[in-house]
Amino acid sequence: MFGSSGFGNKSMFGGSNISTSTTTPAANTTQNDDFLVDGAPEDTIQVIKFSPTPQDKPMLACGSWDGTIRVWMFNDANTFEGKAQQNIPAPILDIAWIEDSSKIFIACADKEARLWDLASNQVAVVGTHDGPVKTCHWINGNNYQCLMTGSFDKTLRFWDMKNLPNQTQMAQIQLPERVYAADVLYPMAVVALANKHIKVYNLENGPTEVKDIESQLKFQIRCISIFKDKSNQNPAGFALGSIEGRVAVQYVDVANPKDNFTFKCHRSAELVNGFQEIYAVNDICFHPQHGTLVTIGSDGRYSMWDKDARTKLKTSEPHPMPLTCCDVHSSGAFLVYALGYDWSRGHEGNTQPGSKIVIHKCIEDMKPRPTKK
């Protein structure tokens, strides 16, 4: 289903180094050899992403509800430097790196998608919707490149970057509901909608819908992440997280329906006033080498899972605030997650000061356990 073909002409931005701004002190070490990144925004961090390159000195970017997007450089196992920051006049809902890490796309609540050129430190509007832009993903195809944005205006739009500063829309897909979450692992794209349906697209010849899958989850979808097949070569399916403390594992082309399943997570171990406390799954990431996954929740914990063995690998101790978003570095060595208020208890529940960013060494924690004979 997911091979290769053409769609437009490939356009290259080219690569350049980031211009260095003020440097923050070295990160502070926390328990279990985790590392606290200095200079986190005050407001809730909505999205956090490692850069694709370079492997030895990756960068880290986060977008916040206060409209700030920040970039750090990872120098060694204990030291992070703040490199750059931009202030956007709207909450930031998503970000996406370009493949050479020279630029970042920004999805904003003011109905605009922006591009931040790190070398020139300039920000330009590259796409516009009729509602808040909830998701953005850079598609680096075999024969074309473009930005994919999903919005509360019930559309998925694709933008050509060759004619900047002019906005050039390559395609638009009308959807039955608002976009709540999306992911891209070329040539697959998945888009989770407010009606709990997931649209699956093949991107090889331009965006072509190949499936409409109804979620196994009964409650609102919060996050979605694509996983590869067991050979770790091609995209095979996706995992969904919901506000009900549950994850669904769904294959796109499933030989055995029993391969699709759900599991409970991010719930209190003890009953509270006779009831179990249930927390939202705020983000999901797959390990690039092991194929295992990490979930983070409003309970302030992260948990690591082996979906093939259907076992839990690890659950963290509780943090004092919800975990709002996460990412795993392409080397598989590091998990980054953000702490902050996730608004699950409304305005009156916002008593937690500021946000925090933590780096966790995860390559051993996320390694599948040997099967018992």
From Swiss-Prot:
WD repeats: 40-82, 87-126, 128-169, 276-315
Subcellular location: Nucleus, Nuclear pore complex; Nucleus; Cell projection, Axon; Synapse
GO cellular component labels: axon; nuclear pore; synapse
Listed name of the protein: mRNA export factor rae-1
Keywords: Acetylation, Cell projection, mRNA transport, Nuclear pore complex, Nucleus, Protein transport, Repeat, Synapse, Translocation, Transport, WD repeat
Family: Belongs to the WD repeat rae1 family.
Subunit structure: The nuclear pore complex (NPC) constitutes the exclusive means of nucleocytoplasmic transport. NPCs allow the passive diffusion of ions and small molecules and the active, nuclear transport receptor-mediated bidirectional transport of macromolecules such as proteins, RNAs, ribonucleoparticles (RNPs), and ribosomal subunits across the nuclear envelope. Interacts with rpm-1.
PROSITE patterns recorded: WD_REPEATS_1, WD_REPEATS_2, WD_REPEATS_REGION
Record keyword Transport present: yes
Tissue: Expressed along the ventral and dorsal nerve cords.
Keyword Metal-binding set for record: no
GO molecular function, one term: ubiquitin binding
Annotated GO biological process: mRNA transport; protein transport; RNA export from nucleus; transcription-dependent tethering of RNA polymerase II gene DNA at nuclear periphery
Known function: Functions as a component of the nuclear pore complex (NPC). NPC components, collectively referred to as nucleoporins (NUPs), can play the role of both NPC structural components and of docking or interaction partners for transiently associated nuclear transport factors. It is specifically important for nuclear mRNA export. Has a role in neuronal development, where it acts downstream of rpm-1 to control axon termination and synapse formation in anterior lateral microtubule (ALM) and posterior lateral microtubule (PLM) mechanosensory neurons.
Organism in which the protein naturally occurs: Caenorhabditis elegans
UniProt modified residues of type N-acetylmethionine: 1
